Amino acid sequence: MNTEKYSIFHVQGGLGKHVAATAVARCIKNNHPDRKLIVVCAWPEIFINIPFVDRVYQIGNTQYFYQNYIKDVDSLIFHQEPYLTTDHIHKRLPLIQTWCKMYGIEYNNEKPVLKFNNLQKKLAKDTWCVGDKPIMVIHTNGGMMTINAKPYAWARDMPEDIAQEIVDYYKKDYTIYQITKVNSPKLKGATHILSTQEKQITTMELK
């Protein structure tokens, strides 16, 4: 019988939400230091090098998870959605604080944490550090970032003409990268990082 105790933190959503979730993960660990922290998420690259995270699983790749962490095991489950809370919808609290309040854990100003290995550092240097100008990143199209995802959603995405105006205004002073879907409109004057280039995107914060 497994006598270990666990905190199981489930994160879904985009890259930015996962970065914010690292602060929530630290808060969970600080509130329950006697429990091993298990993370199930869409972007495992964000969590895999963090020292206070004991194990990382990608959503959909959780073989024997129930047997290892749920059945007859002392585990706490953190799997609610902060975007659907009253505090977040009414903008009463920042996302991280809303998240921690929803879980009933004490927030002590925990901040996001990112850890990169040497390969990721080299990839970041090769991708994001070209030229002398500071970089600017514009992400015009949200939602699912798969190859066959819808290219544009009028209720969520930035209109192409407005995005192009932003690039035209800043391109003299910044090296501009557009993170975009394979089939989404490409902005003139920007370097395009496709949504399928996950390794490059996850190293953006190094710049």
What are these regions (language model features)?
Residues 1-207:
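Catalytic machinery of carbohydrate-active enzymes
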